[in-house]
Every structure is written in C-alpha cells, then in structure tokens.
Curated annotation (Swiss-Prot):
NCBIfam families: cinA_nterm, molyb_syn, PncC_domain, PRK00549.1. Pfam families: CinA (PF02464), CinA_KH (PF18146), MoCF_biosynth (PF00994). It comes from Lacticaseibacillus casei (strain BL23) (Lactobacillus casei). This is Putative competence-damage inducible protein. InterPro entries: CinA (IPR050101), CinA-like_C (IPR036653), CinA_C (IPR008136), CinA_KH (IPR041424), Competence-induced_CinA (IPR008135), MoaB/Mog-like_dom_sf (IPR036425), MoaB/Mog_dom (IPR001453). Belongs to the CinA family.
Amino acid sequence: MQAEIIAVGTEILMGQITNTNGAYMAKQLTALGIDSYHQQVVGDNGPRLEEAIKLAESRSNLVILIGGLGPTPDDLTKQTLAAHLNRKLVEDPDAMAKLQARVKQQQRPMTPNNQLQAMYPEGADILVNRVGLAVGAWIVNGQHTYVLLPGPPKEFVPMVDHELLPRLAKWSGHAEIMVSRVLRFFGIGESQLVTDLDDLIANQTDPTIATYIKDHEVTVRVTASGATEKDADAKLEPMIGAIMDRDGQYFYGYGDDNSLAKELVKTLAANDMQITAAESLTAGAFQAALGDVPGVSTYFKGGFVTYSLATKAAFLAIDARELAAHGVVSAFTAKAMAEHARRKAAADISVSFTGVAGPDTLEGQPAGTVWIGLARRGQLPEAHVYHFPGGRNDVRQRAVMTGMMLALRALQA
C-alpha cells in the first residue's frame, strides 16, 4: 500500500505559506505503517491538478488531496476530482444546514460558491468538518482511494485526527485504535523543547511525538495505539508525564482548538474572578483577544487603552509628574497602570502593557523592550521586563501572549 499527498494552493507553490499540512499528514501515514514516497504541490489550476492526480494514480493507491475545498473561484479540488472520476457533486444535508445557519447569523445571502462547501462527489463517505464549513470526503474508486481534506490547519488537523485516521487504520490493516493528545506550550522555542525531549523523540515507537510551532507557541502531539481507547490512553500517560517533568513550566493547556485566551477565560470562570487591562503599546490587542472567547463578558467588563502619557494620567488617575519622572517604559508605569486599572474596573486581577513596539527607540530603550504589569486584589502590584525579538507586530503579539500567561499563572497559584 502506498499513499501520495497532493497539496493544492498557489500560495504554497509560490512559497507564500509553508506546507505544514503535508508534513503532518506524512507523519500520520508513517505512524500507521503506510508507505509514502512522493508528495506534490499544485497551484489552483484544474488541468494541472488533474495531471497531478493521474501521476499519483500511476504510483500510489491512496491519493490524499489537501486544500481547495473553500468557496472562492480558485477552490477547484473537489470539482476537478469529481470530473476526473466521472461523478457529480451532491449535497450533504448536515453540512448545508450548518452553512445556512452561518449565513443567516451573518445576515448575508447564500451564494452558489458558498453552497459548494456542502457538496461532495457522489458515492463518497463524508468526513465531517468540526471547525469549518467545507466537508471532506473518502472516495473508493476501483483500485484507488481518494481523500479530500480542507486546507486551513485549524480545520485540517481535527478532520485528520477524528475522521481520517480511524479509516486509514482500517484501510491499512492497522486494527488498533489511534488516540492523540495535544499539549500546548508558551515561552519556550521549538528548538529548545525538542532538545529537552531529544531522547524521547529519538526512541519513540508507540507513542509517537510530533512538535509544531505557530504564532509564538509550540504544540506537542502525542499519539498512541491500542486495542481500545483506554489501552491507548494508558500508553499516553507515561509519555505525557515525562514531557511535563521536563517542560511543564511552559505548559498551559490541552487541545487542538485551545488558546491562551480561552484557557485564561476558563480559569477566570473556575475562580469566579474578573479581569481588566490597561494597554499602551498593544493598543487593545489583549482585550480584543479576550473578546474573541465566547462567554467572556461575565469575567471581563472592560478595560483601558492609554497610548500617551496624558491619557495614562487622565484615564487611570496616575500622577502625571510621577509618570514623567519614571518614564513610560518603566516598572513604575507598568505597576501603576495595572493597579489603577484594577481599582477603576473593580476587577480581581489586571494586566498592563507599556514599552517600545518599534521600529524606533523610546526613552533610550530599544525596540522590543516591554514592561508588563500584574495587579491582584489584596497584593502589591508587580512588573516584569522583556526584550522581544522581531518586528512591531511580533513584539505586540508576544507581549499579549506573555501577559496572558502571567495572568494565567497568577490565577493558578
């Protein structure tokens, strides 16, 4: 049995985005003992995609196509494969109902290109999209089996884990159940984490370990097999324990769809506490990230964006002379912002951000210098200084995530 992966997308072909999906899929095939000797990348072009499919058929009996299932005119994968197999596209009622609900919620009309997301080649088995709208498919056609998977990683990974891997295990004669656990880490680079886990990775058999980096955090996927889910879980626990023994101080939560913001809101809920923030260089990004989490309004009533010294003094009632004396980029300002914001919002915990996003220096401090303040009810405020690498947006994003990690650890203490 041989599998071939075809990544579809002009952005991948042009080097604008990295083909992380192909690497992830290849690791899963290896874990199942399925040989894969070739991968292809094809742009959003129907004729060239069909050529790639024909080439894959000539040397593999499992063809996995990733990407091109969305609603835009250049999303041609399912149409191209359906035409190649001489099958029409039919509608999945469940996917269409989900799509209609989304369209209604957004108060916009249903368009034919949107409807395509709920279509699949006739005779295929549906692979449910737990995150997005475009359905995947498992298609058996003679001696070949074809798989359609969405391109966005947040949709692709859950579909592979929950929908595809059980089918692949059966298809390959791998009778055991595969179970994966995703561990999320922040504050450590992938290279350092891999170094820390070097012997575990080098000696892995079952469970297997795979690491990924995205948006300044690292995820570790640990996968084990067993006759039952309980058996697989029993294999996972010692490996997860070994990982946590080495890098547990950077761990913040489990799950594909988790985030620091979600984990922070969950912990606020568990403690029945409210949070606020006072932001300078991050310009409200911390509060915006909190606002993306459903149900946050119970634990976050509002906050402050105080970019200039004058607004810090006016909105937060901080003595302007003290601010001028210590400077914007200082421990004093970070502490004062956090504590005054907490008092004004009557919150239990508060985070503040002040510093130099760049590219220019400020008060003699280089770009990337960030002070983050933390204030808790009944405790003295504290401030932490960081020197983040990267451009302006990277500095701001790292600051927001670091502030979330600080607040999370304070709530867990």
